[in-house]
Protein backbone atom coordinates (compact mmCIF):
# COMPACT_ATOMS: atom_id res chain seq x y z
CA UNK A 1 0.00 0.00 0.00
CA UNK A 2 0.99 3.63 -0.15
CA UNK A 3 3.03 4.91 2.73
CA UNK A 4 1.27 7.33 5.04
CA UNK A 5 -1.86 7.57 2.95
CA UNK A 6 -3.80 7.85 6.19
CA UNK A 7 -7.31 6.65 6.83
CA UNK A 8 -9.70 7.30 3.99
CA UNK A 9 -12.40 9.63 5.27
CA UNK A 10 -15.43 9.92 3.04
CA UNK A 11 -15.67 13.56 2.08
CA UNK A 12 -18.30 15.11 -0.16
CA UNK A 13 -15.97 17.92 -1.33
CA UNK A 14 -13.10 15.60 -2.11
CA UNK A 15 -14.66 14.11 -5.19
CA UNK A 16 -12.05 15.38 -7.66
CA UNK A 17 -11.18 12.63 -10.15
CA UNK A 18 -7.72 12.36 -8.69
CA UNK A 19 -9.04 11.36 -5.27
CA UNK A 20 -11.54 8.92 -6.74
CA UNK A 21 -8.82 7.30 -8.85
CA UNK A 22 -6.52 7.02 -5.85
CA UNK A 23 -9.34 5.55 -3.80
CA UNK A 24 -10.28 2.97 -6.45
CA UNK A 25 -6.62 2.06 -6.86
CA UNK A 26 -6.35 1.48 -3.10
CA UNK A 27 -9.45 -0.71 -3.13
CA UNK A 28 -8.00 -2.66 -6.04
CA UNK A 29 -4.76 -3.30 -4.15
CA UNK A 30 -6.44 -4.25 -0.87
CA UNK A 31 -7.92 -7.60 0.04
CA UNK A 32 -8.61 -7.02 3.72
CA UNK A 33 -10.87 -3.98 3.80
CA UNK A 34 -13.03 -2.99 6.76
CA UNK A 35 -15.78 -0.39 6.50
CA UNK A 36 -16.67 1.67 9.58
CA UNK A 37 -19.93 3.56 9.18
CA UNK A 38 -22.47 5.74 10.92
CA UNK A 39 -25.81 7.47 10.36
CA UNK A 40 -24.72 9.26 7.18
CA UNK A 41 -24.66 5.93 5.35
CA UNK A 42 -28.43 5.53 5.83
CA UNK A 43 -29.65 9.11 5.35
CA UNK A 44 -29.87 8.54 1.57
CA UNK A 45 -32.26 5.69 2.37
CA UNK A 46 -34.50 8.19 4.14
CA UNK A 47 -33.46 7.35 7.69
CA UNK A 48 -32.95 10.58 9.67
CA UNK A 49 -29.78 11.14 11.64
CA UNK A 50 -31.09 12.29 15.00
CA UNK A 51 -27.76 13.89 15.85
CA UNK A 52 -27.77 16.25 12.88
CA UNK A 53 -29.15 19.76 13.28
CA UNK A 54 -32.05 19.16 10.92
CA UNK A 55 -32.48 15.67 12.32
CA UNK A 56 -34.97 14.62 14.96
CA UNK A 57 -33.90 17.16 17.58
CA UNK A 58 -36.11 19.88 16.18
CA UNK A 59 -39.21 17.75 16.07
CA UNK A 60 -41.91 18.00 18.68
CA UNK A 61 -41.27 15.85 21.72
CA UNK A 62 -41.12 16.88 25.36
CA UNK A 63 -37.53 15.68 25.72
CA UNK A 64 -34.57 15.54 23.35
CA UNK A 65 -33.96 12.14 21.69
CA UNK A 66 -30.87 11.54 23.84
CA UNK A 67 -33.08 11.62 26.93
CA UNK A 68 -35.83 9.45 25.45
CA UNK A 69 -33.36 6.91 24.06
CA UNK A 70 -31.76 6.33 27.46
CA UNK A 71 -32.01 3.33 29.75
CA UNK A 72 -33.47 5.46 32.56
CA UNK A 73 -36.22 6.86 30.34
CA UNK A 74 -37.01 3.41 28.96
CA UNK A 75 -37.42 2.03 32.50
CA UNK A 76 -39.42 4.98 33.88
CA UNK A 77 -41.52 6.08 30.90
CA UNK A 78 -41.72 2.92 28.81
CA UNK A 79 -44.90 3.89 26.97
CA UNK A 80 -43.54 7.30 25.97
CA UNK A 81 -40.27 5.62 24.93
CA UNK A 82 -42.20 3.33 22.60
CA UNK A 83 -44.28 6.19 21.18
CA UNK A 84 -41.05 7.90 20.08
CA UNK A 85 -39.38 4.63 19.08
CA UNK A 86 -42.24 3.55 16.79
CA UNK A 87 -42.58 7.03 15.37
CA UNK A 88 -38.93 7.85 14.73
CA UNK A 89 -36.71 4.78 14.96
CA UNK A 90 -38.65 2.15 13.04
CA UNK A 91 -38.18 3.14 9.40
CA UNK A 92 -39.16 -0.25 8.06
CA UNK A 93 -39.95 0.89 4.52
CA UNK A 94 -36.39 2.17 3.99
CA UNK A 95 -34.41 0.39 1.28
CA UNK A 96 -30.63 -0.03 1.02
CA UNK A 97 -28.81 2.58 -1.09
CA UNK A 98 -25.77 2.48 -3.40
CA UNK A 99 -23.29 2.48 -0.51
CA UNK A 100 -24.94 -0.57 1.09
CA UNK A 101 -24.95 -2.48 -2.21
CA UNK A 102 -21.38 -1.49 -3.10
CA UNK A 103 -20.12 -2.79 0.26
CA UNK A 104 -22.01 -6.06 -0.20
CA UNK A 105 -20.35 -6.42 -3.63
CA UNK A 106 -16.89 -5.82 -2.16
CA UNK A 107 -17.55 -8.51 0.44
CA UNK A 108 -18.74 -10.94 -2.24
CA UNK A 109 -15.55 -10.24 -4.20
CA UNK A 110 -13.56 -11.29 -1.12
CA UNK A 111 -12.08 -7.82 -0.57
CA UNK A 112 -14.20 -6.54 2.31
CA UNK A 113 -13.95 -8.60 5.50
CA UNK A 114 -16.39 -6.76 7.77
CA UNK A 115 -18.79 -3.86 8.06
CA UNK A 116 -18.66 -2.23 11.49
CA UNK A 117 -21.71 -0.02 11.85
CA UNK A 118 -23.22 2.33 14.42
CA UNK A 119 -26.58 2.02 12.65
CA UNK A 120 -29.46 -0.08 13.90
CA UNK A 121 -31.51 -0.27 10.69
CA UNK A 122 -30.31 -3.60 9.26
CA UNK A 123 -29.87 -2.10 5.77
CA UNK A 124 -26.39 -3.61 5.29
CA UNK A 125 -27.87 -7.09 5.70
CA UNK A 126 -30.81 -6.16 3.46
CA UNK A 127 -28.27 -5.28 0.74
CA UNK A 128 -26.63 -8.68 1.12
CA UNK A 129 -23.74 -8.05 3.51
CA UNK A 130 -23.02 -11.11 5.66
CA UNK A 131 -20.41 -10.05 8.23
CA UNK A 132 -21.99 -6.99 9.84
CA UNK A 133 -20.95 -5.96 13.34
CA UNK A 134 -23.73 -3.84 14.80
CA UNK A 135 -22.17 -1.82 17.62
CA UNK A 136 -25.50 -0.33 18.68
CA UNK A 137 -27.70 -3.38 18.08
CA UNK A 138 -30.63 -3.68 15.67
CA UNK A 139 -34.30 -2.71 15.54
CA UNK A 140 -34.90 -6.11 13.94
CA UNK A 141 -34.07 -7.96 17.16
CA UNK A 142 -36.39 -7.51 20.12
CA UNK A 143 -36.66 -9.80 23.08
CA UNK A 144 -38.92 -10.52 26.03
CA UNK A 145 -37.13 -9.45 29.21
CA UNK A 146 -38.79 -12.33 31.07
CA UNK A 147 -38.49 -15.42 28.86
CA UNK A 148 -36.11 -14.21 26.13
CA UNK A 149 -38.45 -14.91 23.19
CA UNK A 150 -37.49 -12.88 20.11
CA UNK A 151 -39.79 -10.58 18.15
CA UNK A 152 -39.54 -8.79 14.82
CA UNK A 153 -39.54 -5.04 14.23
CA UNK A 154 -42.94 -5.46 12.54
CA UNK A 155 -44.34 -6.96 15.74
CA UNK A 156 -43.19 -3.87 17.67
CA UNK A 157 -44.54 -1.49 15.04
CA UNK A 158 -47.97 -3.12 15.07
CA UNK A 159 -48.23 -3.41 18.86
CA UNK A 160 -49.96 -0.81 21.02
CA UNK A 161 -48.52 0.93 24.07
CA UNK A 162 -45.81 -1.19 25.66
CA UNK A 163 -45.34 -4.38 23.61
CA UNK A 164 -45.66 -7.57 25.64
CA UNK A 165 -44.66 -11.16 24.98
CA UNK A 166 -47.39 -13.34 23.47
CA UNK A 167 -46.01 -16.33 25.41
CA UNK A 168 -45.50 -15.10 28.96
CA UNK A 169 -46.78 -11.52 29.02
CA UNK A 170 -43.34 -10.10 29.83
CA UNK A 171 -42.20 -6.71 28.59
CA UNK A 172 -40.38 -6.60 25.25
CA UNK A 173 -37.21 -4.54 24.82
CA UNK A 174 -35.50 -3.70 21.53
CA UNK A 175 -31.98 -5.10 21.18
CA UNK A 176 -30.54 -1.63 20.65
CA UNK A 177 -27.92 -0.02 22.85
CA UNK A 178 -29.57 2.89 24.64
CA UNK A 179 -27.70 5.77 26.24
CA UNK A 180 -26.27 4.66 29.63
CA UNK A 181 -26.02 1.06 28.39
CA UNK A 182 -22.77 -0.69 27.54
CA UNK A 183 -21.93 -2.04 24.12
CA UNK A 184 -21.95 -5.79 23.56
CA UNK A 185 -18.50 -7.00 24.58
CA UNK A 186 -18.26 -9.69 21.90
CA UNK A 187 -19.24 -7.28 19.11
CA UNK A 188 -16.62 -4.81 20.35
CA UNK A 189 -13.92 -7.48 20.47
CA UNK A 190 -14.81 -8.65 16.96
CA UNK A 191 -14.69 -5.07 15.68
CA UNK A 192 -11.26 -4.53 17.26
CA UNK A 193 -10.05 -7.76 15.68
CA UNK A 194 -11.17 -6.86 12.15
CA UNK A 195 -10.03 -3.23 12.35
CA UNK A 196 -6.60 -4.12 13.73
CA UNK A 197 -6.04 -6.72 10.98
CA UNK A 198 -7.33 -4.60 8.09
CA UNK A 199 -5.06 -3.36 5.32
CA UNK A 200 -7.56 -0.63 4.43
CA UNK A 201 -10.11 1.11 6.62
CA UNK A 202 -12.88 3.09 4.94
CA UNK A 203 -14.85 5.45 7.18
CA UNK A 204 -18.20 6.76 6.03
CA UNK A 205 -21.17 8.68 7.33
CA UNK A 206 -19.91 9.27 10.84
CA UNK A 207 -18.53 12.26 12.69
CA UNK A 208 -16.83 9.83 15.09
CA UNK A 209 -18.52 11.70 17.92
CA UNK A 210 -19.83 8.67 19.79
CA UNK A 211 -17.59 6.78 22.19
CA UNK A 212 -16.60 4.05 22.70
CA UNK A 213 -17.37 3.29 19.05
CA UNK A 214 -15.17 6.09 17.72
CA UNK A 215 -12.21 4.88 19.78
CA UNK A 216 -12.19 1.72 17.68
CA UNK A 217 -10.40 3.36 14.79
CA UNK A 218 -7.34 3.76 17.02
CA UNK A 219 -6.86 0.02 16.56
CA UNK A 220 -6.21 0.47 12.86
CA UNK A 221 -2.55 -0.09 11.98
CA UNK A 222 -2.74 -0.21 8.20
CA UNK A 223 -1.31 2.35 5.83
CA UNK A 224 -4.44 3.58 4.08
Residue positions per predicted region:
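Conserved catalytic core of sirtuin-type NAD+-dependent deacylases
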Residues: 4, 8-224
Amino acid sequence: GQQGAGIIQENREATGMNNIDTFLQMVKESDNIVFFGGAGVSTESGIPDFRSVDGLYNQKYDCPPETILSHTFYMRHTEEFYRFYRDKMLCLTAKPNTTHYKLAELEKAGKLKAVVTQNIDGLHQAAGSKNVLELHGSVHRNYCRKCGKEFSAEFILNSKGVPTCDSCGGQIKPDVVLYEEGLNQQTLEDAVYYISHADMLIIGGTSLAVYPAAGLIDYYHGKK
